[in-house]
Structure formats: structure tokens, C-alpha cells
């Protein structure tokens, strides 16, 4: 497992521990999701949920200091994510990878 993968796993663990079911999904998108990232690439994630952005950025900063990897989160509230259908959302839905979900499926 590479450093980026370890950093991302730890980020998800900390977000889940801090915010719990307030986070519905964490979706990886961008170059890392497509597999065309390089050493300088950041890790793009979309977080669908009700989270305090300052607290989230504290986690991002801790990961950067501990792993040397920059995670770039975008946060959307669930109702906003459900309504938006712009090119960004379409790209995330088509190329993104759901890394975490608290949504139960039947």
C-alpha cells in the first residue's frame, strides 16, 4: 500500500470517527480515482454530509503533516448533492469511487 493510500485510509477513519453518521458518503474523484495521478497530485474527495468544515480541515492538516499528502475535500450537504446535476456532479458520479457510505441499501 502506497503512502497516498495510507493517508486516504487514515483520513476516512478519522472523518468517520469524528462525524459518524453525519457523513453519508466519501467519494474519491479526480486523477487518483482515474488512476492517472503522479507524485504531486492531491487526493480529491467529495464528502456528502453535514460536517463542520473547520474541524474537517483540522483532519486534512493533520494528514498533511503526518503523511505529506494533501487531501482536497469538497463538502456538499445531502440535499444539495441530491439536487445538483451539473458537470461536476456528473463527473464525480461517472468516474468517482465511493470509499465510505453510511447509507444502508436494501
What are these regions (language model features)?
Residues 1-25, 34-39, 48-106:
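Catalytic core of pol beta-like nucleotidyltransferases
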Residues 31:
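Conserved H-loop
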